[in-house]
Amino acid sequence: MNESAYARGDSWHDYDDEWESDFHREEDSELLSHSDGSDPAGVAGIGTRRSGRTAPDSRSRGVYVEHPHTAFEDVAVAEEPDQEPLPFHPDELDPETAKVEDFPAFFHHKVGEYGDFNWFSRFYLEIRQLFMLLLTTIGLSMVMGLAILRYMNPFRKNYPKARVDFEYERRITGERYSERVQYYAEFWGYQCEEYDIITRGGWILKAHRISDPRRPGGRGYPVVLQHGILCTSLFFFTSEERSLGFWLVDQGFDVWSTNIRSNFGAGHTTNKRWDPRFWAWSLIELGDDLVDVVDFVLRETGYRQLAFVGHSQGTGSMFLALEKYKELGTKLSSFTALGPAVYPGKSLNRLPFRVMRMVPSRWAWSLVFGVREFMPPLGIVRQILPKFLFGHMAYIVFGYLFDFHDHNWVDRHKPKVFCATGVLTSSELLYYWLHCFVARGCVFDPRLRRPWFPPTFPPLTIAYGTIDHLVVGKPLIDRLLAYESNVQIVHILELQGYEHMDMVLGCDAFKVVYPKIKDTIVRTIDPEDVPFVEVPRTGRYI
């Protein structure tokens, strides 16, 4: 394929036969000899010329890396992206982690196993959790102190503030701070319905469906939004009418913002929240849940396909699910990855994450961070402090942890975003990110010459920031252009001056990023995919 199918207007299905032959080529089972993370294929540097578009490389199949103008470029000189991933260490496997044949493209992470509990084992568990609570309270206090010192440091690096419409920045909306999607939806004139999605493993996931009661007719084509780590579905609704979720509703789509396990107090059909088995999951299990999420939304809407938009961890779990479940790709008309979490950035190799990685084993990790929720003192602080104060404090702490800046944000949005950030999540999940993702330097095995993804992989759009240091997008682009012949790329957006959350929260994201998301969805919808069933829950035809 020397030309993008979308550039010619062809269907992506026309290339199934060619993709299948590529997928089974003789070198599929070979590994790259340079396991130290070097670039034997010579693909690094594809798409680095600053312009509206970058000329395609001979291996890029006619795909252009787009450089849309951002508000940051109005106040600062464009810089080359700092997108070096952490070194890849394939042999840094924990005793509990191994690569097995059932997962040929990514490293399998075996979560902790826990049997039934009697009164003695429950008592022992609670004693250990109390010890963990003491340690994490001390650790959180130290982090908060360091974060405040960083925030008050007059010499720390700051980027120029992006220009925002004066009237928009100064206006008073009358919103209060809330952790409920329903509140913001109703405040801005939308309707929010909450659904419980029960997965095959018994976990109950909360999903919020947003619609506009002022618009006549049906709801439109279904779009699923999946948030990142330590966030909830509220992440897509905190920028007023410029929120991604509301913006997509205004464009005529049926928006579903879904949550991972444990968010909004969601439970399990059998395991209680005190049970470690309730919290025994990592990114791979979150990818398993997405299969049930997609099936649920398709049943409710009556469509055969839907569009998926993920941010950060929401992209990593979908990448894993699409590799593991080949049929899942046939149910997605498109996949938009904002800040894709496939290669870690340098922020995850600094304090305090480097100290956390020094914990030598899962047993030691469970002693320090417990076997249930991660950092329970954070939840206690959330309950004690007023939402306004907690939002500002969380902004300072997470700014220190992830080394981000707020130069692209509207100031009044910050406490709204962070009063719903830092939610309690699985300790096992953080163990995966720090002991598998960061330690090895990739979710998948980059030594594989064969494609990571099958021919059923849906059309893909990727957007990443040039100063995103939490995860890096450019190495993923290089990999896609060099080896992933099964992936049909719609857009690649390299956003100058954007950080990890700016694709959703940036002051000009509604002009720079959102239209590309809509274009991806519209261009990949099957025109024959129309709803055909009555929704039993509401009794309305979609």
PLM features: residue spans?
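Intrinsically disordered, low-complexity regulatory segments
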Residues: 1-167, 356, 389, 393-397, ...
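Alpha/beta-hydrolase-fold enzymes
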Residues: 91-95, 99-158, 299-304, 313-446
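N-terminal cap/lid segment of alpha/beta-hydrolase-fold proteins
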Residues: 174, 179-215
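Short, surface-exposed "cap/lid" segments of acyl-processing enzymes
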Residues: 199-273
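Conserved acidic catalytic loop of the alpha/beta-hydrolase fold
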Residues: 273-277, 287-306
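Short beta-strand/loop motif that positions the catalytic acidic residue
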Residues: 456, 461-464, 468
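Conserved alpha/beta-hydrolase "acid-adjacent" motif
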Residues: 469-475
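Catalytic active-site module of serine/aspartate enzymes centered on a nucleophile-bearing elbow/loop
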Residues: 486-542
